[in-house]
Structure formats: structure tokens, C-alpha cells
């Protein structure tokens, strides 16, 4: 464990898995899916593995700038794990709650392959996801103490901010961590490809048009002129179940797309 004034690093290991197992055992949400350590509350809030995996499959590894994949509010780590294992990149998770951070680190360990050298650079930082300067320093220090001299940049940023519980609607500034400050804090640490940095935002599907416009304005303020694609994902029933924004290097040619998701794969894209 690497101590820092504002962050400390957890290096995924079998020891952390043992500690996590004392909190909650690893279970699969569905037959054939990976097992994860999650409390009931975490399981309720976590993105399903099938959706997380499909998102990773939509990204071409060659489109990503060089560097690690960062999840600045990682929670259980399911989406980050799907991205890092699918795209063969190291993962950096940041989680404010130390108890959740422990489970996230354990999940990174049990889903990784020992032969995959990328996994030796996986870390979970317990601390504030908006404090980019101290977070990246803590990450690099942890790598150095483990014998890795590299100072990898951030190749992709993922953010799924917490929203008010049981709220049918919420305001943009109620997201935690706050979207604007977080994007601004990490902007200078993101590697840039031909279409800009790679950022994936996972938002509430209940955002109305005005709220989506505020998100667009926040993105434009941080990354002027950057391309983005709004994705509306439905699992049936005539409703939108997931809303996300694919920014920069992972955007498509269209400003929006609708996806019909089956149990395990995309059924149609419009």
C-alpha cells in the first residue's frame, strides 16, 4: 500500500481478495458471467456485465490514445474491468469509499489473467476522483515502488457519477463527483488522438433535453469543438435504460445513436 496525503493505492492481490471475501463473497449476477465481490447496494447500482462488455466491444483498441484506462468513480469496477480486459489496457480505479475500493481491487484481481502483464499496472486509488494531480502522483509512486519506472498517461476516462437515490429526476450539479470540475481536472492528463481524448460518460436516462444541453455545454467548455455521440440504449419495453456520451476518439460519425440490447449482445443500432 502506497501512502499519499490525499490518496492511497491498493495493488490488486490475493491478499486483498481474502480481505474482500470476509466482507462479501464473489457471485455471478447471471450464469456464465464473471464473479464479483459486491454488497447488495453495490449490485443494485452497478452496470450489468452484459452492458459493460458490449460497451467495451464497441471501442476499437486502435482508436484509443496510448495510456491506461481511468475510472474516476469506479465503484465495483465492473465497467472498468470490462474495458481493460477487452481492450488489453491497464486500469486505474479511483473510489472515495475505502470499503468499496477494497472490493474493487479484489474484483480486478479475480478477473485478471496471471499471464497478462498489463494487470501488473492495475491500481485502485482511495481518494477524491476530482483531485487529478495528487491521484496521478499516487499512481506513479505506487508503480515505482513496485519496480515499474513508467509514468503512463491516461488513454481513456470513464465516469459514472452517483446520482440521488430513489430520485425520479435530479439536477446536473447533484452528480458526485461533479462533472465539470472532474473533466477540467483531468483534461491535461488525457492523451489525445486525432479526434481528441477518449471519454465515456455514463448518465441517468432520465435527463431531460435541458439537462442534456447542460452536459453538452460542460463538455464543450472543457474540450472545445470535440466530437461526441449520445447513445440511448434500450433493453425493450419501449423505454431508454441507459444514456451515455462517447467523446473524442471513441465517438462515431453521428451525433447520436439508439441501441436495442438483447440479453447478451446488441440486436440493432439506429
Predicted features along the sequence, with ranges:
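S-adenosyl-L-methionine
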Residues: 1-65, 101-148
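Conserved SAM-binding motif I beta-strand of class I
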Residues: 90-95
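Conserved SAM/SAH-binding beta-strand->alpha-helix loop
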Residues: 97-99
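Class I S-adenosyl-L-methionine
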Residues: 158-270
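Conserved acidic residues
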Residues: 67, 155, 197
Amino acid at each position: 500500500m502506497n501512502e499519499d496525503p490525499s490518496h492511497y493505492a491498493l495493488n490488486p492481490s490475493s491478499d486483498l481478495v481474502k480481505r474482500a471475501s470476509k466482507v462479501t463473497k464473489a457471485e455471478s449476477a447471471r450464469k456464465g458471467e464473471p464473479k464479483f465481490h459486491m454488497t447488495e447496494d453495490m449490485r443494485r447500482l452497478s452496470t450489468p456485465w452484459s452492458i459493460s462488455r458490449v460497451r467495451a466491444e464497441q471501442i476499437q483498441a486502435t482508436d484509443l490514445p496510448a495510456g491506461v484506462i481511468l475510472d474516476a468513480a469506479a465503484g465495483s469496477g465492473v465497467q472498468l474491468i470490462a474495458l481493460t480486459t477487452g481492450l488489453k489496457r491497464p486500469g486505474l480505479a479511483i473510489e472515495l469509499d475505502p470499503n468499496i475500493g477494497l472490493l474493487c481491487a479484489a474484483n480486478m484481481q479475480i478477473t485478471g489473467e496471471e499471464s497478462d502483464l498489463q494487470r501488473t499496472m492495475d491500481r485502485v486509488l482511495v481518494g477524491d476522483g476530482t483531485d487529478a494531480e495528487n491521484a496521478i502522483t499516487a499512481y506513479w509512486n505506487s508503480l515505482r515502488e513496485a519496480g515499474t519506472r513508467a509514468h503512463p498517461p491516461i488513454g481513456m476516462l470513464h465516469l459514472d457519477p452517483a446520482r440521488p437515490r430513489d430520485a425520479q429526476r435530479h439536477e446536473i450539479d447533484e452528480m458526485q463527483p461533479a462533472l465539470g470540475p472532474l473533466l477540467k481536472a483531468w483534461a491535461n492528463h488525457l492523451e489525445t488522438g486525432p479526434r481528441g481524448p477518449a471519454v465515456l460518460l455514463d448518465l441517468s436516462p432520465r435527463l431531460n433535453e435541458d439537462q442534456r444541453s447542460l452536459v453538452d455545454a460542460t463538455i464543450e467548455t472543457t474540450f472545445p469543438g470535440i466530437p461526441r455521440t449520445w447513445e440511448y440504449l434500450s433493453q425493450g419495453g419501449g423505454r431508454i435504460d441507459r444514456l451515455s456520451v462517447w467523446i473524442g476518439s471513441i465517438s462515431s460519425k453521428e451525433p447520436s445513436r439508439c441501441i436495442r440490447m438483447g440479453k447478451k449482445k446488441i440486436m440493432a443500432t439506429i
